[in-house]
Regions:
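Positively charged n-region of N-terminal signal peptides that target proteins for export
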Residues: 1-7
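Bacterial N-terminal signal peptides
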Residues: 7-19
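N-terminal and secondary-structure boundary signal
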Residues: 22-352
Length: 352
């Protein structure tokens, strides 16, 4: 299977029988629906009520029940890659766990997926080395950079230079190469996909947190599901010409999209400039929880919100050229890049 876009090539190498997905089963077309629920104080109970109301309305509106299937597992793709201060809220994660357990998922079959062990520990998703406190006892946390959750049959191929980390500026060669200090040219071309989300789970939910991004324009739903969800992807952050294409092509993988049920983001805190590094001086908080099956239109909405905040503080806006990955993703059928096409479903009657 191969997609070509801006000289970037997607290769999904499948060993015979390695996929649990039907090859002829296409993901549903994007709807443009965004569900919204107002929050009051960002407490656990606040999130729990909002998530349950959103789930009930989604199930009623679409006819799709968020219940266990044949695999009896569900994955939550968390975001921790801006470091302490800007990560998927714990209250939201606890609320989702409660809602999914209510629908029949067993405690141990709800797992979390994150990328970098240091940032997962600094943001509290992994136990503190000092206290050993586990934030989500009984729920596995899969750390992708451990190298344990990739399958050599599933990779994205691109002839870009080797990797670097846009947040810490440390080379991640050893971790991504299975402990080796050097890598071959062939290995450097490959970004291995995180298989637990689309091979082990009935479906998975994407939980992005929003920042701007100097190369991609917007760091949100699409990026959390792609470049923060595979090995050896930091290399793409070097090039504005190739990174948008890589995000769009990875997001268009049918097997990944088939189980990609929802994107849910809290506007408890988002950052409008200086990202993906966390900087509290450039953050905004709004009392809204947003949910959509369409990651592209959610990102398009947030580009507008980031630009509103930039305008108020005297910064230049994110342009269409800056965020062209949204157009690329729309061309590949991942979603709609035009925020004018949003169909709002205000579960509690509020308007963001």
């Amino acid at each position: 299977m191969r997609l070509l876009l801006q000289k970037t090539t997607f290769l999904l190498a499948l060993a015979l029988g390695s996929s649990a997905f039907a090859a002829d089963k296409a993901p549903p077309p994007p709807s443009g629906d965004i569900w919204e629920h107002r929050l009051t104080d960002f407490s656990d109970s606040d999130y729990r009520f909002a998530v349950e109301q959103l789930f009930q309305d989604f199930e009623r509106t679409t006819g799709h029940k968020l219940v266990p299937g044949a695999k009896k597992k569900v994955g939550l793709k968390i975001y921790a890659d801006s470091g302490p201060g800007l990560a998927t809220p714990f209250g939201l994660v606890r609320a989702l766990i409660a809602a999914l357990e209510k629908r029949g998922f067993e405690h141990q079959n709800i797992f979390l997926v994150g990328l970098n062990p240091l940032r997962l520990r600094l943001t509290g998703f992994l136990p503190s080395l000092a206290t050993g406190v586990v934030p989500f006892p009984g729920h596995p946390v899969y750390v992708l950079e451990s190298g344990k959750f990739y399958d050599p049959a599933w990779f994205y191929d691109s002839p870009l230079p080797s990797r670097f980390d846009p947040v810490t500026n440390d080379r991640a060669v050893e971790a991504a190469a299975g402990g080796k200090s050097t890598t071959t040219t062939e290995e450097d071309r490959k970004s291995f996909l995180a298989t637990p989300l689309f091979l082990d789970a009935d479906f998975w939910i994407n939980l992005p947190v929003y920042t701007d991004h100097p190369v991609l324009g917007i760091n949100g739903a699409l990026v959390n599901a792609t470049l923060w969800n595979a090995s050896n992807t930091f290399r793409f952050f070097k090039s504005p010409a190739t990174a948008p294409a890589a995000v769009a092509e990875m997001a268009a993988i049918p097997e990944l999209r088939e189980g990609w049920a929802l994107n849910i983001t809290s506007l408890q805190l988002y950052q409008f400039i200086g990202g993906p590094y966390f900087n509290s001086l450039y953050t905004v908080s709004e009392p809204h929880l947003l949910m959509s099956t369409d990651p592209v239109i959610l990102d398009a909405l947030m580009v507008g919100k980031l630009n509103e905040a930039r305008k108020k503080t005297g910064f230049e806006p994110i342009t269409e050229d800056d965020s062209r990955m949204l157009d690329y993703a729309a061309q590949l059928g991942v979603g709609s890049s035009d925020a004018k096409h949003i169909h709002w479903i205000h579960v509690d009657g509020a308007t963001p």
